[in-house]
């Protein structure tokens, strides 16, 4: 009898340990290289930490699709959810319910309102990323009165709109003669993005630059320029090196930026694992991530938020990268 009780206790402890270490990593949508790379980093970190990481997302970027996944993961007993939010507030009711049930909620890539999560794994502040967009463009645009188009995913997505707001403010301050002729959206759809990019180039034959801080919009703008045989347009923005490599090699794109999204996925899972094992992280605390280093929890104010609370903050990626013909082959994601 005593032996049976010992075996039963050991079995229950193993089951409990397995159930306590399940992390859901949710992109805006599946089938996009940027998000797949982030998911790969998340799963690599899970394997190294001995936790079970599930990567899944909607087939189209929608609040309802993400909410359904969040609810499913909560009902299945997952202990942490890390989501790239398609809306700053649309996911909040589902995420708040998850937190009430003891689930650790984090965001990565695109944030919710800060009160709807604990930690945001942030690729850069709006000032850093908006500034980088303008810096890449100004190095290629020689006209004092340049005509510029902005082209990205949607008018509601959190991260890209913050970057574009800062980029436009920088242009107004530092390049007051530049004219922003249009701001258009591809809605995370490759076909629509290509059609929209071609439409922009046709509508503005004297366009000097397209600024496209979106993983679908940037390659679409480059492909549109090639399809229409348009030269002399500076095409800059954010996407992954594997997607952009052919356009860089052909000279259609001279430079574009991003951050190491594989590292972002790894950092997110490491932070979630730290929350599960040791509890809240507060502003000023640090997290050690193997092969990356020590990362400090920053206040939400670095993202321009007014909300601060215990166990709530932002972990910034240590660096951003500008890719060009000289360095693009050093990266594979």
Curated annotation (Swiss-Prot):
Question: Its principal location?
Answer: periplasm
Gene3D superfamilies under this entry?
A: 3.40.50.2300
Q: Name one GO cellular component term.
A: outer membrane-bounded periplasmic space
Record keywords: Signal included? Answer: yes
Q: Which InterPro entries match?
A: Bact_Solute-Bind_Prot2 (IPR050555), LsrB (IPR030159), Peripla_BP_I (IPR028082), SBP_2_dom (IPR025997)
Can you say where in the cell this protein is located? Periplasm
The signal peptide annotation in the UniProt record is 1-19
The keyword Signal is annotated on this UniProt entry:
yes
Q: Which CDD domains match?
A: PBP1_LsrB_Quorum_Sensing (cd20003)
- Top-rank taxon: Bacteria
Q: Which UniProt keywords apply?
A: Periplasm, Signal
GO MF annotations, alphabetized = carbohydrate binding
Q: How does it assemble?
A: The complex is composed of two ATP-binding proteins (LsrA), two transmembrane proteins (LsrC and LsrD) and a solute-binding protein (LsrB).
Question: What function is annotated for this protein?
Answer: Part of the ABC transporter complex LsrABCD involved in autoinducer 2 (AI-2) import. Binds AI-2 and delivers it to the LsrC and LsrD permeases.
Family classification: Belongs to the bacterial solute-binding protein 2 family.
Name the NCBIfam families on file: PRK15408.1 (NF011937)
Q: Please identify the protein, giving its name as recorded.
A: Autoinducer 2-binding protein LsrB
